[in-house]
A protein has these predicted regions:
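Tandem-repeat/low-complexity and Cys-motif detector
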Residues: 1, 57-59
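Short terminal alpha-helical segments
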Residues: 1-35, 89-93
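Generic L/I/V-rich hydrophobic alpha-helical segments across diverse proteins
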Residues: 8-11, 15, 34, 38-41, ...
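Charged, low-complexity interaction regions
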Residues: 20-28, 46-56, 71-80
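Short stretches within intrinsically disordered, low-complexity N-terminal or propeptide regions
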Residues: 21, 35, 43-46, 53, ...
Length: 94
């Protein structure tokens, strides 16, 4: 299993956690999970061969969804946050 596949799986599992717990977890827990997803994306995108990776598009989709979800979380709009997460998961699956 390659490094980018591991990054994708870590990000995907974090986003699944977020999708299932947007309403019942404290804001700090959600911020930590989003931070983990974003940090993993940052590390993956800094890799030398990221541009040639087949996981480039899914990682970018999850990173964009996490960034949008963070903005909605900061505004207190958890339902929109969940929608962004689900949209990103759907885009990453294609």
């Amino acid at each position: 299993m390659g490094i980018y596949q591991l990054c994708y799986l870590k990000m995907h599992s974090g986003m699944l956690f977020l999708a299932g717990h947007t309403e019942d977890k404290e804001k700090e827990t959600l911020l930590k999970a989003l931070s983990d997803v974003m940090d993993t994306a940052r590390k993956a995108m800094a890799g030398k061969s990221f541009a040639r990776s087949p996981y480039r598009a899914p990682i970018a989709a999850l990173a964009a969804g996490a960034a949008a979800a963070l903005a909605y979380l900061e505004q207190g709009e958890r339902e929109k946050m969940r929608e962004e997460i689900l949209t990103a998961l759907n885009a990453a699956a294609k």
